[in-house]
Each structure stands twice: as C-alpha cells, then as structure tokens.
Regions:
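Exposed aromatic-hydrophobic patches
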Residues: 51-56, 152-154, 191-192, 218-225, ...
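Short, acidic Ser/Thr/Gly-rich low-complexity loop/linker segments typical of extracellular
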Residues: 26-56, 134-136, 208-220
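Autoprocessing Asn-cyclization modules and mimics
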Residues: 98-198
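Short proline/glycine- and polar residue-rich coil/turn motifs
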Residues: 46, 80-86, 143, 182-184, ...
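A short, solvent-exposed beta-strand micro-motif common in secreted/extracellular proteins
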Residues: 58-70, 217, 228-242
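Beta-strand-rich domain onsets/edges
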Residues: 1-14, 20-23, 85-124, 129-138, ...
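Structured interaction patches on ligand/partner-binding surfaces of diverse proteins
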Residues: 70-91, 240-261
C-alpha cells in the first residue's frame, strides 16, 4: 500500500525592507530595480507595495544593495541574530535619478557637478533648501524651546509627511535640520532629535530636499507638489568630502529648470 506524507517547510524570518519612491511616496518602479545582498546568493521575496523579505539567513552582518536606472543607488547594512524576539524592518526612500520618468509639468531642477579640473564627480551630496517670498505653507504654531523633543505645527498642506526634512532658521537663530520620528498626534510632531536652539512661534519650516549625483555628475531635484502656487527661491549646496559648491535660483513651478554646472572647490 502506498504511503503518502505531507511535509511542511517553515521559513524563519530574517529581514524585511520597504522601498519607497521619494517623489510619489509609493512603491518604486520595478522595471530595472535590483535588490540584492552583497556576497550572498539569496534573492528576496517581493510582497508588493515595495516590501522585500529575506528568510533563513545565517547569523551575521549583511549589506543590502539597491540599484536601478530610475533611482540613485543605495546600500544599507543589517544584522541577523537567531532567536531575536523583535523583527528587523527598515524603510528606505529612493531618490529619483536623472533618468526617472517624470511627467510633463512636474517641477524639476537639473544640474551637473564638476571638480576643479573639469571632470564630473559622482556620488556628491546635494541639499536644496526652499525659501518663500510669501505664503509659507508650514510654520511653528507655538514657541519651541531648546532641547524640545516635539513641535506644534501649523500646515496649509495637510499632514506633514514623515519622509520630509526641514530647516528651522531665523535671523537670530542658527539653522537646524529637523526630521519627524513618528506620526503626529493632532498638530504635535515628535522629533528624531531634540532641538539645539529655541525658535519662536511663526518660524517657517523650510523644505529641505536631498539627493545625490549619478556617476556622470548629474542630479535632479523634484519640487514638492504643494509648491505649485507658491513664490519661492531655492538654495543648492553640493558637497563631496571637503569640497563644496553653491547655487541659487527662483523656482518656476511646472517647468524643468537647468542651473547648468556647479563647480566643487576645496577650502584654501
């Protein structure tokens, strides 16, 4: 008589990462997306909505590499420890590359970065700060004390996205880059780090946009959608090791603007 056996194979969860398109805040384009471990053959299971799951990894430290034609390459390290009671999950925001399929009418700033000898520089960090001529959409609704761990925000654009970064700055207070740690309770937003300085009620939260250059030294900054009817200027700062470059321009919503080239210079 034939005997039949049912075998169940159980996988042990190791690591999960959610990839998010920094521009759309949704799942990234997958046409050229590669999500792999450096020096390890396992391929993750894609669960949809940008989630990638690794299972049954031996204990150790791993490097996850993310590459795509549409996004700037990323890498992140994580560890696997057998018996860990808490799950290891991460959210990684992917910044659009110059090859990203933006739509007609999107507000874009494009440029190229060169070093002093005229050659392009890849991987340079690009930081763009938006300042308003009027009608700033996000402000402090109450005074913020030094060492404050949360802010009370007044926003004309609805709830502020946790992926957003801002610069707090006044003529008498040094600038501080802030990020929010978790969803707000009403208008109260917890900070990832306490404030280093105090800021008065009404201080504008200046949107801070970040990206990197590709291997050819090219970059693109996509403006937030809520800027469509706002008069604003943008200050761009580019850094690579000790070298830095700067540019400034008026924003024209609904257009693609080129600032040409920015040269990186080392301090003398």
């Amino acid at each position: 008589m034939d005997q039949h056996f049912q075998v169940r194979i159980r996988s042990v969860f190791s690591y999960a990462v959610r990839l998010v398109d920094m521009y759309t805040r949704g799942a990234p384009f997958r046409s050229s997306l590669s999500v792999r471990l450096a020096n390890h053959p396992q391929v993750p299971v894609c669960k949809g909505d940008g989630w990638y799951i690794f299972s049954d990894l031996p204990d150790g430290i791993y490097t996850l590499t993310i590459s795509s034609r549409e996004y700037i390459d990323r890498s992140v390290s994580f560890s696997v420890i057998t018996g860990r009671t808490s799950y290891t999950e991460s959210v990684i925001y992917l910044h659009p590359s110059p090859a990203y399929p933006f739509r007609t009418g999107d507000s874009l700033i494009r440029g190229r970065i060169f070093v002093e000898d005229g050659s392009p520089t890849g991987g340079a960090y690009v930081q763009a700060v938006i300042s308003y001529e009027r009608d700033a959409p996000v402000r402090l609704a109450e005074d913020a004390d030094k060492e404050a761990t949360e802010l009370i925000i007044a926003s004309k654009k609805g709830q502020v996205d946790l992926a957003d970064a801002f610069l707090l700055e006044t003529p008498t207070c040094k600038g501080t880059i802030i990020r929010f740690a978790s969803p707000p309770k009403g208008r109260v937003y917890p900070l990832t780090e306490p404030l280093s300085f105090a800021y008065p009620r009404g201080t504008v939260l200046l949107p801070l946009l970040e990206t990197y250059c590709d291997d050819r030294g090219e970059f693109v900054v996509a403006l937030p959608l809520f800027l469509e009817k706002t008069h604003a200027r943008m200050k761009i700062e580019v850094r690579r090791e000790e070298a830095a470059g700067f540019a400034e321009l008026s924003i024209q919503a609904g257009t693609t603007q080129s600032i040409g080239t920015i040269q990186l210079n080392r301090p003398k």
